[in-house]
Amino acid sequence: MLYANPNTESSPVGFRKKYDNFI
């Protein structure tokens, strides 16, 4: 659940990673 992680949303790299994982 990376997309549910607040730390991932705060980080620009994590933001793109959460989207990459979603797709």
Curated annotation (Swiss-Prot):
One of its GO terms (biological process) is alcohol metabolic process. The keyword Iron does not apply. It is an enzyme of class 1 (oxidoreductase). GO terms for molecular function: alcohol dehydrogenase (NADP+) activity; aldehyde dehydrogenase (NAD+) activity; zinc ion binding. It catalyses: an aldehyde + NAD(+) + H2O = a carboxylate + NADH + 2 H(+). Its EC number is 1.2.1.3. Keywords: NAD, Oxidoreductase. The keyword rRNA-binding does not apply. Belongs to the aldehyde dehydrogenase family. This is Aldehyde dehydrogenase. It comes from Moraxella sp. (strain TAE123).
